[in-house]
Amino acid sequence: MTNLGGRQSEVLLNRVAANIGQAVDAVEAFWGTDWPRDIAVVATGSQRQFETEAGGGPAAQWTDIAAVAVADRVDPARRIAIGQRIVFAPGAVSMSTSALRIVLNHELFHYAARADTAVDAPRWLTEGVADYVARPATPLPEVTPLPTALPSDADLAAPGLQRSLGYDRAWWFARFVADTRGSATLRAFYRAACGVGHADLPTAVHNVLGSDMAGVLADWQQWLTRQSAR
């Protein structure tokens, strides 16, 4: 645990330490146990510090982000991620325990799956599966209008409401796959669509979900309608 932000960050790191065990359990239940346990966590004291520790880039991409899992380098052939860490933004100190657990579980999944995830993996799917691991299966709101396409990386690119809805749609899709085909199939789909040397999305949908893009979209829409009606 690395404290870069003083007393408040120390309190946050203590809360992370108190909740890391349940996060490990949640990730293992979905992903398995073949991933490193030397978990590095960094708590930052300013937004600029967070952006630097998170890897830099345009400041807008870090707006509304509570934490991020990053690595300095990944060696896919050896399944090793070098310099892995979970970095918390300064605003994370004010999160409730339930919110902190969701963020911690989400980022720990990325940490666990990093060495098996391609650099060019569809981000929306990596985020949707991470949210499946992290978020409780709460009832869905009424979804209107129904999505006319699967989620995309562009849905997650813009800060604010668009990003929030993009994450929700990606999560709903991951829940749909797990609910209709089982969590093991969702894991297999992640590996097929996001793993090193992954297939393109239509091929992964065909090979793992046994459908085509139009069919899986129609099935997802029907699932969303059923869930919203509950």
Residue ranges and their predicted role:
Residues 1-108, 115-122, 140-141, 156-158, ...:
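Juxtacatalytic substrate-recognition/specificity segment
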